[in-house]
Amino acid sequence: MTAQMHEAGRTKEAGNRLQAWRTGIDTYQEPVVYMRRDCPVCRSEGFTTQARVQLTAGGRSIVATLSVVDGDWLAENVAGLSESAWASLGAQPGEPVAVTHAPPLDSLSHVRAKVYGNSLGDAQFGAIISDVAAGRYSDLHLATFITACAGDRLDLAETLSLTKAMIAVGDRIDWGRPLVVDKHCVGGLPGNRTTLLVVPIVTACGLMMPKTSSRAITSPAGTADTMEVLAPVNLDVPSMRRVVERTGGCIVWGGSVRLSPADDILIRVERPLDLDSEGQLVASVLSKKAAAGSTHVLIDLPVGATAKVRSAHAAASLGRRLQEVGGAIGLQVFLRVTDGEQPVGRGIGPALEARDVLAVLQGTREAPADLRERALRLAADILEMGGAAPAGGGLKLATEVLADGRAWAKFQAICSEQGGLRSLPMAAHLHTVESPGTGRVTRIDNRLLARAAKLAGAPTAPAAGIDVHARLGDRVEAGQPLFTLHAQAPGELAYALEFVRARPPIFQISENV
Amino acid sequence: MTAQMHEAGRTKEAGNRLQAWRTGIDTYQEPVVYMRRDCPVCRSEGFTTQARVQLTAGGRSIVATLSVVDGDWLAENVAGLSESAWASLGAQPGEPVAVTHAPPLDSLSHVRAKVYGNSLGDAQFGAIISDVAAGRYSDLHLATFITACAGDRLDLAETLSLTKAMIAVGDRIDWGRPLVVDKHCVGGLPGNRTTLLVVPIVTACGLMMPKTSSRAITSPAGTADTMEVLAPVNLDVPSMRRVVERTGGCIVWGGSVRLSPADDILIRVERPLDLDSEGQLVASVLSKKAAAGSTHVLIDLPVGATAKVRSAHAAASLGRRLQEVGGAIGLQVFLRVTDGEQPVGRGIGPALEARDVLAVLQGTREAPADLRERALRLAADILEMGGAAPAGGGLKLATEVLADGRAWAKFQAICSEQGGLRSLPMAAHLHTVESPGTGRVTRIDNRLLARAAKLAGAPTAPAAGIDVHARLGDRVEAGQPLFTLHAQAPGELAYALEFVRARPPIFQISENV
């Protein structure tokens, strides 16, 4: 060791401490640290912007991306933390923070190999997912990994490796029962909020269904977003366990129970990129089901020209992949292919979808028949798969339980255990788009509809979204309402409307049909 | 239009103005705007973190990524701009800034199509590159595009479309001459700094060679980084033109002449990701050569097990692609495959490489013979391809011009015109790694060597890098120096040394050879 190395060693011990300071900057989920260019740490360590640094305070370490600052608002002796860095480091204001180079990320070489078209195995996916779950990947690294696995770039063996790696970094709930049912919808269909109906129906029939749901990734509302309008969903595992023990079921946000820490991190980049991947979808869904302690899982696969799954062929291929990987990790996977040609129910967006759900549960005149029928079909499958109804007898039982109010009572009990049933918020800014001509509705573009609902503010603004007034095959007159945009802020209403006006018509009205 | 829409229109006119404020936050090149969560714009427009927003001041507009802030250091009525947002918006402190939703980025659907494995055509690449050049892509979008095109995912037609799209968004210099020569090295070989020798040799023989070079993307030094140690390289087009008119050549940074605005933006994400793509490499190189007004281009393709091009087969494939695309856009492309088994010269890193270049130009005893020979070979090719020497006579002419001092005089003239020859900086913190045993050097891992040089601070710290003391085939004794790490900061020296110690040996010493 040379004289310089001894000096370097000393620097490492003493010279690299700053004081923790909360900047209040929301960088979404990527941890960022702000340090003055002329602070002692940047000078001695040679740090520049975009460097990945390790922050250590009170024995806890995180990796963050550095932004160097020239500006008096940041003191020379502080490490300014973004909100996510502040939360994950858990430091006290003014507490000493040691700042060092982040350890080299060797698993990135596997990501690079995947980008270049090579196949990865258990060890490589294990290394990548373990680094992802530990927060060692920057958003750029995550974007590269997700893109490299997107489309159909993961084969069966790779999808299984990824699934196992994602299960390995999380916890797994043991319910002490031989049969725990679950469902998942592959999505892409606005308003398809059947979970909020299926869970109360099947738990009212004695099955156990501890449902963890996701927030929206690329859609205007995830099931967790919609449920949150009606009851708290940010439960931890002990609270979730209490709700399930008392009611047989729950509908909580999977991110708060943190059963799939890697998945929660990947989702933060999938959302702004609006990318899906078959392999990642399978790994994400099945690792969460395994972690939640499920044994029997029904997968709803809506198929339609503008849904996520666009053909019966694609549904069969995805379904087979789900069953193969499920079998390899000890999950029995059942499939139900459903019609995905148009939105389900009337509302798109958290509050508008929740309103439809309540109407079905309460059997009111406004209850959308399609949402009710889809939920009954899926509940019937689960009742039969779980042995609560004889083969072919599921639909009759599900229909009775919904009609006689047992499902509504069960839903209220679940909401109450999760923290209390809430009343629905309403949007203040509305605009109705009318039919330009007279004719029949021959096509509805789900993707444009979902994008317009997102531009109107959904799901961040829970009352925002779209109310759909016409369905496929309906006859409409010129000037008749097709759909209404709901927004909580005037700027968002204007933005969504501008989008709708600039695109091809979302509803195709044909005169001679 | 409803009452709400009129209200939205009014808000858009008046309510969305904040005052420009320079935060001094360096976010590398991504423009970021910091706004208080409770500011009037966030409240009226419903903006949340990660939103892409359009900022307009004095008729100039940019798109930036929003970070929402809860914190008193940022005033309620300001739009806090990152350094890159501040520079590109060009606002005055306190100037009103209008903040609106960024227009929807329709070209992202093409990126998504490419991610899912579809081929893109002229129109799609044109739309993507035009949005990239206009700064409408976030770093996450750029990472997705780059990953989707990485490896060999672009076919010939797509590579040509991308090249044409990149040329279309930039300027093209017209030198008014039928023959303008250029060279490019595909890279991956530390220390291969032949450009600084080739330009003075061939311009001393009367050819015109206006060389724009890049900064390091994934290497410890780019040609522009090395040249910058010796003379200013941040010239604009008129200054570059003046240098070339007076001396016949130049060596400037391509990013400052801004001939390839899209390429300059893509590189900002390629660097942290350490990703290369054949299609993007071809498009990047050839679009820059076309923009610089070159007509005849020599491509140096170093081949070696740990170089960027690893086999003669890969070199032939890449070379063919460069010639095909070059031909289609009117560039004559010549190839020279060179040995890429070990670093060139002794130094790795801007200042250490510049020192080697000066030794060759001045013919001193320390001049690395391999660097000298490689440069003479390439200069000879260019002299013949440009008609300054008869076929087979290039090497003799190049050798004479270097030996008699004309090349050194020309290099000084070019440096002087670019702003003056500078003296070399030296690193303060050194550590020499010695051979663990006695034997012959049978393998040198260029990739690990380059990574260690980067961890030591190169190229951001110009004096940082590695001095290599042994070459392939050399016999070394135990304890004999193999290489010396140079760093400007003690932390960086420690970090690089830690890396070297944790990896397999960079130099393989075999006893029985």
UniProtKB/Swiss-Prot annotation, chains A, B:
Protein origin, superkingdom: Bacteria
Any one cellular-component term (Gene Ontology): cytosol
Catalytic activity: thymidine + phosphate = 2-deoxy-alpha-D-ribose 1-phosphate + thymine
GO molecular function annotation: 1,4-alpha-oligoglucan phosphorylase activity; thymidine phosphorylase activity
Family per record: Belongs to the thymidine/pyrimidine-nucleoside phosphorylase family. Type 2 subfamily.
A biological-process GO annotation: pyrimidine nucleoside metabolic process
Entry keywords, A to Z: Glycosyltransferase, Transferase
Pfam families: Glycos_trans_3N, Glycos_transf_3, PYNP_C
EC class name: transferase
EC nos: 2.4.2.4
Name recorded for this polypeptide: Putative thymidine phosphorylase 2
InterPro entries (alphabetical): Glycosyl_Trfase_fam3, Glycosyl_Trfase_fam3_N_dom, Glycosyl_Trfase_fam3_N_dom_sf, Nuc_phospho_transferase, PYNP-like_C_sf, PYNP_C, Pyrmidine_PPase_CS, Thym_Pase_Put
